[in-house]
Regions:
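Conserved beta-strand hairpin/beta-sheet module of binuclear metal-dependent hydrolase folds
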Residues: 2-52, 128-138
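Active-site neighborhood of phospho(di)ester-bond hydrolases with catalytic His/Asp-centered motifs
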Residues: 33-34, 55-63, 82-85, 118-121, ...
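Core dinuclear metal-dependent hydrolase active-site scaffold
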Residues: 22, 106-131
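Short active-site segment of divalent metal-dependent hydrolases/proteases
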Residues: 64, 68, 125, 142-143, ...
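Active-site HxH/HxHxD metal-binding segment of metal-dependent hydrolases
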Residues: 17, 28-31, 38-115, 195-203
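Accessory terminal helices/loops
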Residues: 2-3, 161-175, 179-238
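A short acidic, helix-capping loop that chelates divalent metal ions and anchors anionic groups
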Residues: 89-93, 144-151
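Internal catalytic or translocation cores that form aromatic/hydrophobic pockets or channels
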Residues: 131, 136-142, 146-147, 156, ...
Length: 238
């Protein structure tokens, strides 16, 4: 939630611990749903509870667990679907006139400005949505983790560059809203990530790729807790 002209409402839905987000523009009561999936009835009920008009759907990427409620939601709301052009091309799915974007584009939701970041790695056209001092990161960045890169469209080298860019460009007090509830807490700041996300500790692509592709999933279990740089060094993983 924010003290600005918007609020971010989170809902954990489905068997894969997905977070679905409702971005509320306070002045206009317009609402954008990020990654509608699983229980569309609950999403609509939450919007109605806050007297919100769902006018937009934002996709962080095209994996089924993040998009399987689009058609159902469009039956309930006259909404415009937004995603990055490279993700639409990777997805190869027919949508009725979606709005295709590029990294750096901005959306306007009432009086709220939403900046779209192109963050490839989990998929070629993965996107994060930045509004004020908060960012919705999909499966790019989790609390103390990052998205897999071994699925179709995944690329660990691209993920390394994406996280490196986020470390350099985003303010440390920015609040992270991830795509799944995989960790010991639902959200955190970028400063928390820099301190405790093992993927943020790597300075070169080769060691990052080795950890992401061959080590991480064998050595960590959910819920993810913080791992310091020193802990990685002691374990000879850095």
């Amino acid at each position: 939630m924010s003290d600005s002209g918007f609020k971010v409402h989170s809902m954990e839905l489905g068997p894969m611990e997905n977070f679905v987000y409702l971005i509320e523009d306070i002045a206009s009561h317009r609402c954008a749903v990020v990654d509608p999936a699983w229980e569309v009835g609950q999403i609509v009920a939450r919007a109605n509870q806050h007297n919100l008009d769902i006018t937009d759907i934002l996709l962080t990427h095209s994996h089924n667990d993040h998009i399987n409620g689009i058609e159902d939601l469009l039956n309930h709301a006259h909404a415009e679907v937004h995603l990055l052009k490279p993700e639409y091309e990777f997805w190869a799915h027919e949508l009725d006139k979606p709005s295709l974007h590029h990294g750096g584009d901005e959306l306007t939701l009432g009086e709220t400005t939403i900046k779209i970041l192109h963050t490839p790695g989990h998929t070629p056209g993965s996107a994060c949505y930045q509004l004020g001092n908060e960012i919705i990161t999909g499966d790019t960045l989790f609390v103390f983790g990052c998205g897999r890169c071994d699925m179709s469209g995944g690329n660990p080298e691209h993920m390394f560059e994406t996280l490196k860019d986020m470390k350099q460009r985003l303010p440390q007090d920015m609040l992270i809203h991830p795509g799944h509830n995989y960790s010991v807490k639902e959200t955190c700041t970028l400063a928390d990530q820099l301190e405790g996300n093992p993927f943020m500790h790597y300075e070169d692509a080769e060691t990052f790729v080795n950890y992401r592709m061959h080590v991480h999933d064998r050595t960590r279990n959910e819920p993810y807790d913080a791992i310091s740089k020193q802990q990685l060094k002691i374990a000879n993983l850095l």
